[in-house]
UniProtKB/Swiss-Prot annotation:
It is found in: Secreted. Its EC number is 4.2.2.2. Binds 1 Ca(2+) ion per subunit. GO terms for biological process: cell wall organization; pectin catabolic process. It comes from Aspergillus terreus (strain NIH 2624 / FGSC A1156). It catalyses: Eliminative cleavage of (1->4)-alpha-D-galacturonan to give oligosaccharides with 4-deoxy-alpha-D-galact-4-enuronosyl groups at their non-reducing ends. This is Probable pectate lyase F. It holds the Pfam family Pectate_lyase. GO terms for cellular component: extracellular region. Its cofactor is Ca(2+). Residues 1-17 form the signal peptide. Pectinolytic enzyme consist of four classes of enzymes: pectin lyase, polygalacturonase, pectin methylesterase and rhamnogalacturonase. Among pectinolytic enzymes, pectin lyase is the most important in depolymerization of pectin, since it cleaves internal glycosidic bonds of highly methylated pectins. Favors pectate, the anion, over pectin, the methyl ester.
Length: 234
């Protein structure tokens, strides 16, 4: 039976060209360790020129939840980060306060979450184009806002979830995710959404070995634990 919470269009890996770059993390042109988060102002573009950035040795202390101050980059609404490698020494990778654009952003070893998006509103869109992430024991993209996240031609390897609509944020809402041309290997779920809040997921030309690429949850608000209730079917 077709789920009303998601539209899922997945082809088997052998039936299409995997579009996520599978050649590994690019070789950095430079390496910068910073004691504080780098903020990118609203609407501004930060082109790192393929340098690697992190927060210094010991910054990752496991998978405990961090804040934006623990991130390597903090993007204000409409900001763009591009051509960068996030090193393994970080507690949080990139935080977006509102919709943002990430172009060819690579994470060599995710600590807690690679990308956190919050305070985006219905009708606003975040774009994650190219790039990839390795060794994310939990989530790559954590979506706490209420807009749409587009993930295009991204590569994920050894991960828990590529995208997760927040399962227990104190204030819940409908969220949307569009995934196209993504390659996801040796991981768990490509997408996890909350069916009870009306979340939608569209997966197109996803190249993955996941048993269930799209998973439905019953989300909740506040100090609670969301429950898995099924799978998205096309």
């Amino acid at each position: 039976m077709r789920s009303t919470a998601a539209v899922l269009s997945i082809l088997l890996p052998g039936a299409l060209a995997c579009l996520g770059y599978e050649g590994g993390v690019p070789k950095p042109t430079a390496h910068y360790s910073n004691s504080k988060v780098i903020e990118i102002a609203a609407g501004q573009v930060f082109d790192a020129g393929w340098a690697k950035y992190d927060r210094g040795s010991g910054a990752c202390s496991g998978d405990s939840e961090g804040s934006w101050q623990d991130a390597v980059f903090y993007l204000h609404s409409g900001a763009t980060l591009k051509n960068v490698i996030i090193g393994k020494d970080q507690a949080e990778g990139v935080h977006c306060d509102g919709p943002c654009n990430l172009e060819f952003v690579w994470f060599e070893d995710v600590c807690e979450d690679a990308i956190t998006i919050k305070n985006d509103k219905a009708g606003q869109e975040t774009w994650i184009v190219g790039g990839g992430a390795y060794h994310a024991s939990d989530k790559i993209v954590q979506h706490n806002g209420c807009g749409t996240v587009n993930i295009i031609n991204f590569y994920a390897e050894d991960y828990g979830k590529v995208y997760r609509s927040c399962g227990n944020c104190s204030s819940q809402c409908k969220r949307n995710v569009y995934v196209e041309g993504v390659t996801a290997r040796d991981g768990g779920e490509v997408v996890g959404i909350n069916s009870n809040y009306g979340d939608t997921a569209t997966l197109k030309n996803v190249c993955t070995d996941a048993s269930h690429p799209c998973v439905l949850y019953k989300g909740c608000a506040g100090g609670c634990e969301p429950s898995k209730v099924g799978y998205c079917s096309g």
